[in-house]
Amino acid sequence: MGRCCFYTAGTLSLLLLVTSVTLLVARVFQKAVDQSIEKKIVLRNGTEAFDSWEKPPLPVYTQFYFFNVTNPEEILRGETPRVEEVGPYTYRELRNKANIQFGDNGTTISAVSNKAYVFERDQSVGDPKIDLIRTLNIPVLTVIEWSQVHFLREIIEAMLKAYQQKLFVTHTVDELLWGYKDEILSLIHVFRPDISPYFGLFYEKNGTNDGDYVFLTGEDSYLNFTKIVEWNGKTSLDWWITDKCNMINGTDGDSFHPLITKDEVLYVFPSDFCRSVYITFSDYESVQGLPAFRYKVPAEILANTSDNAGFCIPEGNCLGSGVLNVSICKNGAPIIMSFPHFYQADERFVSAIEGMHPNQEDHETFVDINPLTGIILKAAKRFQINIYVKKLDDFVETGDIRTMVFPVMYLNESVHIDKETASRLKSMINTTLIITNIPYIIMALGVFFGLVFTWLACKGQGSMDEGTADERAPLIRT
């Protein structure tokens, strides 16, 4: 009986160890899990991935912060601007995909991304319909910019003088965000009906969409899940100088493909930024107990380098690191994009304005992604809208203002997975962990039987050494 147990334990140990190593090397269970996820994470009617893509379940909040100008007269005399940050004014975003149509045997899908904003009073510092902000007169600066290359130059100069326009104006937060009827734009509208008489930083962006998209469904490859193929009927942009800079890369930022590795560079096309950007792995995180890869927008995105020379408009006119001139895609308005408080920008942009306090915690853009599913667990998209200003002798409105990139406002668009959704996702992830760890469980059993085998071997050797009383007796007795 003992000898039988001895051989059984040894055989089982050897078989289990060989089996576990074979399964690990062949990645049998890992491949099975990966294939299962690849089949589930695809835009197809009836899949959970499609439902979440069409109507994102997680709440998205956008916080708007404004820079209130406190010394307008001194600025016009050439002194350093002083601004005070006012905010947040928080809005909940209501998002959904509409006009959905499948094409190309289910490998592509077209849609528009609708977005509406609902004010959240309890998460805001005040009432946007009442609170006043003093800032640059962006419509005036825009028409001044138009006058530099526009046939309406003489008309614009005459209108600004006749209507005594000032460089700084005061409006409510609601007006600055969603629009107000501007006097100068209304006059120009008479000559140019295509120019709206209304101005707002997010005018016509509440309850609307940012254009027509064609996405890949991931049917042909999980790596193509929700990648953008076309935007507004174009496969590339036409604003920038080089073909590389005009490429539309990656997703719209609402979703990513599953089975992400930390060595991957992920691409995103945020249409409000007028260009594609990329994010890189930064650190390991845990969100609601779920594992995540933290990806960040690196400083190189807006660095003054040869790789970004194609974004300098006009050609060769690079403003410096940390800022992007997007006037070419904003109807000629002298809008400069940056990160909040000129985070990661050249120091001269920060020191030019009194009231800039850039810091990583509040001003960087990041996204925490569960690498197994590609689901976003937590994210913060942050960018700042600035205006390029300079003194122009032909326009008394500019006074003796310094040439600078002047901050107007910034936003923080954030999302955080809730406990209920996290619990469901955690259950699914734990199940996959059990499956992928089966080879290790088999290996542990192999080690256990190996220990039993060793114990039986030692016990058997001990028994042989001790022997019986007769065996221990001397052969010759006296």
UniProtKB/Swiss-Prot annotation:
Organism: Homo sapiens (Human)
Disulfide bonds: C274-C329, C312-C318
Gene Ontology cellular-component annotations: clathrin-coated endocytic vesicle membrane; endocytic vesicle membrane; endoplasmic reticulum membrane; endosome membrane; extracellular exosome; focal adhesion; Golgi membrane; late endosome membrane
Residues linked to a glycan: N45, N68, N105, N206, N224, N249, N304, N325, N412, N430
GO molecular function: cargo receptor activity; cholesterol binding; enzyme binding; phosphatidylcholine binding; phosphatidylserine binding; protein homodimerization activity; protein-folding chaperone binding; scavenger receptor activity
Effect seen on changing L475I: Some loss in the efficiency of targeting of the protein to lysosomes
Disorder cited: Epilepsy, progressive myoclonic 4, with or without renal failure: A form of progressive myoclonic epilepsy, a clinically and genetically heterogeneous group of disorders defined by the combination of action and reflex myoclonus, other types of epileptic seizures, and progressive neurodegeneration and neurocognitive impairment. EPM4 is an autosomal recessive form associated with renal failure in some cases. Cognitive function is preserved.
Ranges in the topological domain labelled Cytoplasmic: 1-4, 460-478
Keywords: Disease variant, Disulfide bond, Epilepsy, Glycoprotein, Host cell receptor for virus entry, Host-virus interaction, Lysosome, Membrane, Neurodegeneration, Receptor, Transmembrane, Transmembrane helix
Name of protein: Lysosome membrane protein 2
Family of the protein in this entry: Belongs to the CD36 family.
Membrane topology label: Multi-pass membrane protein
Function, in words: Acts as a lysosomal receptor for glucosylceramidase (GBA1) targeting.
Region listing for Important for interaction with GBA1, in residue ranges: 155-191
Membrane-spanning residues: 5-27, 434-459
Consequence of substituting E471G: May act as a modifier of Gaucher disease
Lumenal compartment spans: 28-433
Record InterPro entries: CD36_fam (IPR002159), LimpII (IPR005429)
Subunit: Interacts with GBA1. (Microbial infection) Interacts with enterovirus 71 capsid proteins VP1 and VP2.
Localization, UniProt: Lysosome membrane
